[in-house]
Structure formats: C-alpha cells, structure tokens
Amino acid sequence: MSTSGMLFIFATFCPCFLSCCAFMSHWKLKDFSFRFLRMCGERSLVVCYPLKLLKQIRSLFSIAIGHLSLMLIEGSANLLSLEEISRTLLRILDFVGNKNMRTYLEVPLCRWHISQARPN
C-alpha cells in the first residue's frame, strides 16, 4: 500500500478513535494502552503482511495518541510514561522505515513529547 494511502487511513481513523476515547474511563484506557504498547514494542510481533502491519501500526498510533490526549486534558501527565509512549512510537516508525508517517504524529498535542524523546 502506498504511503499516501496509509496516511489517508490514519487521518480518517484517528479522529473517530479520539472521539470514542472521550467516553472511556481513564484507567481502562491507560491499562489497555500500556499493555498494547509493550506488546507492539516487540519486533517479533510486527509481521511482514502489509494489511496486518497496517492494522497494528494504526491501532498503536490511535491508542497512544488517545492516551496522550486524555492524560494531557486531565492534567495527570506523567513525563516518564509519556516519554515511554513517544519512544515506542518512534521505534515502530523507525522499524517500518517510513519517515513520512512520522510527520502524522506531529500534532500539537504530542509534538513536544516526541521531540523530548529524540532530540533533532
């Protein structure tokens, strides 16, 4: 699948996910997102089939961005956990090797945390 096609799917999916996150309890999202991030951080789970890979990356981005959003809105941000999320996202992006997808994450909500995780 082309980069533009993947970015289109991300751009379509993430706003819907963030809307749904607003109705989820914070502890449930936090628990699920960290378990999912730890699981997806393992290279062995990132498979070579494009569709499955796309679904894993899309889910990872959506959960992490949704979690960052809720933590920042609630004012309960823990810098260590935010840094962990940012580093995990960047590791997945680096492994996939698509630098264009990295710009999709640079929304105002998490730009600072990503820049803290990896200096320019």
UniProtKB/Swiss-Prot annotation:
Q: Where in the cell is it found?
A: Membrane
Q: Which domain of life is it from?
A: Eukaryota
Q: Which terms in the GO cellular component ontology are assigned?
A: membrane
Bilayer topology? Single-pass membrane protein
Record's keyword terms, sorted:
Membrane, Signal, Transmembrane, Transmembrane helix
UniProt entry tagged with the keyword Lyase: no
Give the Cytoplasmic membrane side ranges.
81-120
Bilayer-crossing residues are 60-80
Q: Which residues lie on this side of the membrane: Extracellular?
A: 23-59
Signal peptide region: 1-22
| Name recorded for this polypeptide | Uncharacterized protein C1F8.08
